[in-house]
């Protein structure tokens, strides 16, 4: 009876350690990144000085509010309010404070490894409608690499130029 009890305890201990480990990297719903702010592209990054290989939009942008998340299963949620062309030069006066782009997308950028070498993976989402006031909601998925180190989320044009990035 004592042996049975020890065997049962041992089996339960192994199961308790092994079952959570099976979920690591298996596409579970854990948050990889959770953000409450995005920063609009500014003059030094409009066209020149790409971040992780991604070029900023051609003019400065500003954003009123944002939040979003990336989960281990690849689900990407981004909500932006007031993502518009900056209200200052060099943006033409008639475009300041407006969004001329009808759809926004997102790119999740991870540092990862391929064949033992460090590399960057930029994963584009589908696009979603954006209002002229710069409001949009994306709820989509990407195939995250494993590992996915130092994730960054960019809000982009349909062509992939970024307008806002996770950060301040």
Regions found by a protein language model. Give the residues of each.
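Bacterial N-terminal signal peptides that target proteins for export
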Residues: 1-9
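Bacterial N-terminal signal peptides
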Residues: 9-20
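N-terminal segment immediately downstream of the Sec signal-peptide cleavage site
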Residues: 23-72, 167-168
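Short, surface-exposed binding/anchoring microloops in extracellular/periplasmic proteins
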Residues: 51-100
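Hydrophobic residues positioned within well-ordered beta-strands of beta-sheet architectures
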Residues: 78, 104-106, 138-140
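A mature extracytoplasmic/lumenal domain signature
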Residues: 82-84, 110-112, 127
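Extended low-complexity, serine/threonine- and proline-enriched intrinsically disordered segments
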Residues: 91-115
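Helix-rich interaction surfaces within compact, conserved domain-sized segments
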Residues: 114-168
């Amino acid at each position: 009876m004592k042996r049975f009890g020890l065997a049962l305890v041992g089996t339960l201990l192994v199961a308790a350690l092994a079952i959570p480990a099976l979920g690591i990297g298996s596409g579970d719903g854990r948050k990889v990144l959770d953000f409450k702010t995005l920063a609009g592209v500014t003059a030094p990054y409009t066209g020149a000085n790409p971040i992780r290989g991604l070029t900023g939009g051609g003019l400065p942008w500003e954003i009123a509010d944002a939040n979003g998340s990336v989960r281990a299963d690849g689900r990407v949620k981004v909500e932006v309010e007031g993502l518009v062309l900056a209200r200052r030069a060099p943006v033409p006066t008639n475009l300041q404070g407006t969004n001329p782009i009808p759809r926004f997308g997102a790119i999740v950028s991870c540092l990862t490894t391929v064949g033992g070498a460090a590399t960057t993976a930029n994963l584009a989402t589908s696009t979603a409608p954006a209002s002229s006031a710069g409001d949009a909601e994306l709820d989509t998925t990407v195939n995250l690499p494993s590992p996915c180190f130092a994730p960054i989320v960019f809000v982009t044009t349909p062509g992939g130029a970024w307008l806002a990035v996770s950060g301040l």
